[in-house]
Amino acid sequence: MKPNIHPPYRTVVFHDTSADAYFTVGSTIATERTIERDGQTYPYVTLDISSASHPYYTGKQKEFAKEGSTARFHQRFGSFLTKKTN
């Protein structure tokens, strides 16, 4: 295996700005910013969305109609599809 070709693996603090949640995990992401937490200095990365704020994980996802697409189509355009008898 070739030496010095892999990025350094280190502990990084990710900050979800929309939920104001911090995650300390191992990562190879490159960043110039740092933050001090628990008496140590870590690389710092901001996130727009994470599991702390994503609607799928928070349970605040939008509910779609219980009917299928065919039922919605007939509801919207059903009057145009009825056969007229003269």
From Swiss-Prot:
Q: Which UniProt keywords apply?
A: Ribonucleoprotein, Ribosomal protein
Query: Which InterPro entries does the record associate with it?
Result: Ribosomal_bL28/bL31-like_sf, Ribosomal_bL31, Ribosomal_bL31_B, Ribosomal_bL31_sf
List the record's Gene Ontology CC terms alphabetically. Answer: ribonucleoprotein complex; ribosome
Hydrolase among keywords: no
Entry's Gene Ontology BP terms = translation
Tell me if Ribosomal protein is a UniProt keyword of this record. Answer: yes
Instruction: Tell what triggers its expression.
Output: May be induced under zinc-limiting conditions; in that case may be repressed by the zinc uptake regulation protein zur.
| UniProt-recorded Gene Ontology molecular function terms | structural constituent of ribosome
- What Pfam families does the record tag this protein with? Ribosomal_L31
Q: Which PANTHER family match?
A: 50S RIBOSOMAL PROTEIN L31, CHLOROPLASTIC (PTHR33280), LARGE RIBOSOMAL SUBUNIT PROTEIN BL31C (PTHR33280:SF1)
Which family does the similarity line name?
Answer: Belongs to the bacterial ribosomal protein bL31 family. Type B subfamily.
- Subunit structure, per the record? Part of the 50S ribosomal subunit.
Name of the featured protein: Large ribosomal subunit protein bL31B
Per the UniProt record, the source organism is Yersinia pestis
